[in-house]
UniProtKB/Swiss-Prot annotation:
Gene3D superfamilies: 3.30.70.60. The lineage of its organism: Bacteria, Bacillati, Bacillota, Bacilli, Lactobacillales. The keyword Repeat does not apply. One of its GO terms (biological process) is translation. The gene is rpsF. This is Small ribosomal subunit protein bS6. The keyword Ribosomal protein applies.
Length: 96
């Protein structure tokens, strides 16, 4: 299984319950498509290097996972581009 790390930035003005629901939804998208979520944690609220969608700060969230194929990653990528609460995301394959 290949190891991946996903970092995504959530808009800062989201309510806590909505943020928790968003994180749970995207974690379940990964697990429903065959990936194993090793760790999913909030990093911190950070100032952005440049303004994104009129926001100067964002809530960073990190997910470490293992996947045998790219189906889960492709679905995460597709849905995170559509979702307005996620400002940016990045998927990185870690060296084993």
């Amino acid at each position: 299984m290949a190891k991946y790390e996903i970092l995504y930035i959530i808009r800062p003005n989201i309510e806590e319950e909505a943020k928790n629901a968003l994180v749970a939804r995207f974690d379940s998208i990964l697990t429903d498509n065959g990936a194993t979520v090793v760790e999913s944690k909030d990093w911190e609220k950070r100032r952005l290097a440049y303004e994104i969608n009129d926001f100067r700060e964002g809530l960073y969230h990190i997910v470490n996972l293992e996947a045998t194929d790219a189906a889960a990653l492709n679905e995460f990528d597709r849905l995170s581009k559509i979702n307005g609460d996620i400002l940016r995301h990045m998927i990185v394959k870690l060296d084993a």
